[in-house]
Regions:
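N-terminal juxtadomain amphipathic helix
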Residues: 1-58
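S-adenosyl-L-methionine-dependent methyltransferase catalytic module, highlighting the catalytic core
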Residues: 4, 119-264
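Short catalytic/ligand-binding loop motif for oxyanion handling, primarily in non-cytosolic enzymes
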Residues: 14-15, 33-34, 70-74, 117, ...
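Class I SAM-dependent methyltransferase SAM/SAH-binding core
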Residues: 48, 53-99
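A short acidic, Gly/Pro-enriched loop at the edge of an enzyme's catalytic core
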Residues: 95-109
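A short SAM/SAH-binding and catalytic strip from SAM-dependent methyltransferases
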Residues: 106-119
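Boundary detector for helix-to-coil junctions that initiate low-complexity/charged tails
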Residues: 249-319
Length: 319
């Protein structure tokens, strides 16, 4: 039995085993999503925090690429963050330029998306790089196979559609040279249409593509964190983090937000201590009053006149 605390929601779990995709926590998280949040926490704060316990930093701006609702909703509470999708609204196509966002993002999250974007994948990676601030970073999970070479399934993809043919989806593509090609035996991840698998990465190829797109300090994560339910003893997408230029450091506004929240928490703790102290004083005062009353009752019980009245069934009954 594997016991762990989910680093997304903070709940305790006990599972007999993990698999690649099925959720292993009631919140919906799996090994892949918990690894993603672990990397994010370590890069932002230098320690492994539960996402639900992250400080609220609305000065930190971020974008999600098809993030799961179980952590996207919490990220939205914590940061100036919005989640987007490549296959449905709110749609965000990283293969197209977004000049209004250039240099504005502190981080981008991508969970098993890079294998789906249209070729060449460098176009999307370079756009992510362009949108990040100088200290910004990308955190991603990417399915990787063994070997060295990247395998592009459709290197000549240009104008294409996925159409049914005899009940089976096929890819119809018009290449740049005008040649028409039809491909069957398509691979889809979690759906159809835009979720078509475009390529198979290897760790070496992913590293090369990230560097070629301008990223620095590319780090792959394979360390088990059993207390958070992160185990790499089965097929898990490869977690990776890549910086734009500089190591990440919280900006002054974010540090000020943390200090304000700490002071607010400290004030609440001080008020709680005062309330507890006042409650203790009231309890002690009540105890003293009760003891004084009990002493007076004991004294009254020894009164000859009171005992006489009790013998005749008159007067107060004291115990």
């Amino acid at each position: 039995m594997i016991e762990f605390t989910c680093n997304v929601c903070g709940s305790r779990n006990a599972n007999p085993a993990f698999a690649t995709e099925p959720a292993s926590c009631a919140c919906g998280s799996n090994v892949r999503t918990r690894a993603l949040i672990h990397l994010l926490s370590m890069e932002l704060f230098g320690r492994n925090l539960i996402l639900a316990d992250f400080p609220r930093l609305k000065s930190v701006r971020a974008l999600g690429m098809s993030d799961k609702e179980c952590y996207a909703s919490i990220l939205q509470e914590k940061f100036d963050y919005r989640n987007t999708y490549y296959d449905r609204e709110p749609r965000f196509d990283f293969s197209q330029p977004h000049g209004d966002l250039a240099g504005t993002l502190d981080f981008v999250l991508s969970a098993d998306v890079l294998e789906h974007v249209a070729p060449p994948v460098e176009t999307a990676l370079m756009e992510v790089h362009r949108l990040l601030k100088p200290h910004g970073f990308l955190v991603a999970t990417v399915p990787c196979s063994s070997g060295e070479m990247l395998r592009e399934h459709y290197p000549d993809l240009h104008e294409y559609r996925i159409l049914p043919l005899g009940g089976t989806p096929v890819l119809v593509n018009r290449r740049r040279d005008g040649h028409l090609e039809v491909t069957d035996e398509l691979a889809f991840h979690g759906g159809s249409g835009a979720t078509l698998e475009m390529r198979q990465f290897t760790v070496a190829a992913l590293y090369e593509k990230l560097l070629a797109s301008g990223f620095t300090n590319v780090r792959f994560f394979n360390e088990n964190v059993p207390e958070c339910g992160i185990l790499f003893d089965h097929d898990v997408s490869q977690p990776v983090i890549a910086a734009k230029q500089q190591p990440f450091a919280l900006a002054g506004d974010a540090r000020a937000e943390i200090i304000d929240q700490w002071r607010s928490a400290e004030d609440r703790a001080w008020r709680d201590r005062q309330l507890a102290a006042n409650a203790g004083n009231l309890a002690r005062e009540a105890s003293a009053v009760n003891e004084s009353l009990a002493a007076r009752i004991r004294l009254a019980a020894r009164s000859r006149w009171l005992r006489l009245g009790q013998a005749f069934g008159i007067g107060p009954k004291l115990t």
